[in-house]
Amino acid sequence: MRMMVAGGGTGGHVFPGIALAEEVVTRHPANDVVFVGTARGLEASVVPAAGFPIELIEVKGLKGKGIAGALLNLLLLPRAFLQSWRILKRWRPDVVVGVGGYASGPVVLTAWAMRIPTAVQEQNAIAGLTNRLLGRVVKAAFTAFPEAARHFAARKVYQLGNPIRRRLMENYMRPESAHGQPRLLVFGGSQGAHALNMRVIEALPHLADLRERIQITHQTGARDREYVEKGYRACGFTPDVREFIDDMSAAYAGCDLVVCRAGATTLAELTVCKKPSILVPFPAAADNHQVKNARSLVDAGAAVMIEERDLTGEVLAREIREILDAPERRERMARAAGRLGSPQAAKEIADVCMELVRRRWGSPFGQAREPGQKPARPPDLAS
């Protein structure tokens, strides 16, 4: 089976696609996966690093661009559809899965027009605009939250959760090494979160008595690293401050409490890894979907939510202290998180995709092609 994964832009779209791709290629040596994204998106760097080929198209978003910006970006759409058609003709995928983001629209629509089975994977509680539009033509809509189902025809919905990267799953299944000091993990997504970084530094004076009893790992993003390091040192803390955490599995395995945003992929990782959390939803997220995402964990007793408008150093310090000082509460939160986890999401989504392929092509392995046959890359893909 050859799968094409279209979309990206942010880690929340890209990483579930990579997790699904990892599941597909491990099933059979003849299976392969190709991604389609944009040069500006995170996918342009992380997909090749994960070992998968990627093709690029030229497309930009329409929402929130204003009338002039939307019109200019509309002019790119015919070119994006032509590029998508050429890519689909070369790769001849058996199924195309859109994971959200600008690139998924032209690719999935073109695949549908070419009678290739299509699906979308919606990570959030409120479906994104692109996935809502594509939901009208795709064969399947994979969701992670019950609230997202209302955006799609009931017959198309498979509520299976968000796929988690294989490396995170494998590393987390190893026994954790014992550690005496409470460990706090702070991160704001792949780019960091400026407001969250600032509030953590403001919280430190209120946690001064814990400086010898707590270990902190803090992903800041490139912009704030130097300032955050100075802030910790000024308050007598000796944390592990990084611009970016390459091995999130090790970071999760070594912590007792997580302070982070409420992106859907992050929450999927928290639940599979059974980690208590303090969630600070990103206030500018489309349709305020991070608040909706976070509420699912809060209502289950797995997390505490502080909206950014209410976030101060003192408030954050109080929540951190209350959770770290209460091992039994942490254990209850961890169990609650685990009950929400979907460790089999990638496997179950791949199962449905193989069934779509079987219905269309008569075999779960898809169209007949020579073993290992891949298209030659043209000199100018964007032409």
UniProtKB/Swiss-Prot annotation:
Annotated binding of UDP-N-acetyl-alpha-D-glucosamine, by residue: T10, G11, G12, N124, R165, S190, I245, Q290
Catalyzed reaction equations: di-trans,octa-cis-undecaprenyl diphospho-N-acetyl-alpha-D-muramoyl-L-alanyl-D-glutamyl-meso-2,6-diaminopimeloyl-D-alanyl-D-alanine + UDP-N-acetyl-alpha-D-glucosamine = di-trans,octa-cis-undecaprenyl diphospho-[N-acetyl-alpha-D-glucosaminyl-(1->4)]-N-acetyl-alpha-D-muramoyl-L-alanyl-D-glutamyl-meso-2,6-diaminopimeloyl-D-alanyl-D-alanine + UDP + H(+)
Keywords in alphabetical order: Cell cycle, Cell division, Cell inner membrane, Cell membrane, Cell shape, Cell wall biogenesis/degradation, Glycosyltransferase, Membrane, Peptidoglycan synthesis, Transferase
Family: Belongs to the glycosyltransferase 28 family. MurG subfamily.
Its EC number(s): 2.4.1.227
Originating species: Anaeromyxobacter sp. (strain K)
Domain of life: Bacteria
Protein name: UDP-N-acetylglucosamine--N-acetylmuramyl-(pentapeptide) pyrophosphoryl-undecaprenol N-acetylglucosamine transferase
Function: Cell wall formation. Catalyzes the transfer of a GlcNAc subunit on undecaprenyl-pyrophosphoryl-MurNAc-pentapeptide (lipid intermediate I) to form undecaprenyl-pyrophosphoryl-MurNAc-(pentapeptide)GlcNAc (lipid intermediate II).
Pathway linked to the protein: Cell wall biogenesis; peptidoglycan biosynthesis
Matching InterPro entries: GlcNAc_MurG, Glyco_trans_28_C, GlycoTrans_28_N
Membrane topology label: Peripheral membrane protein
A molecular function GO annotation: undecaprenyldiphospho-muramoylpentapeptide beta-N-acetylglucosaminyltransferase activity
Keyword match Ion transport: no
Location of the region described as Disordered in the Swiss-Prot/TrEMBL record: 364-383
Keyword hit for Magnesium: no
Gene3D superfamilies: Glycogen Phosphorylase B (3.40.50.2000)
BP-aspect Gene Ontology terms: carbohydrate metabolic process; cell division; cell wall organization; lipid glycosylation; peptidoglycan biosynthetic process; regulation of cell shape
Gene Ontology cellular component list: plasma membrane
Compartment(s) where it occurs, according to its Swiss-Prot or TrEMBL record: Cell inner membrane
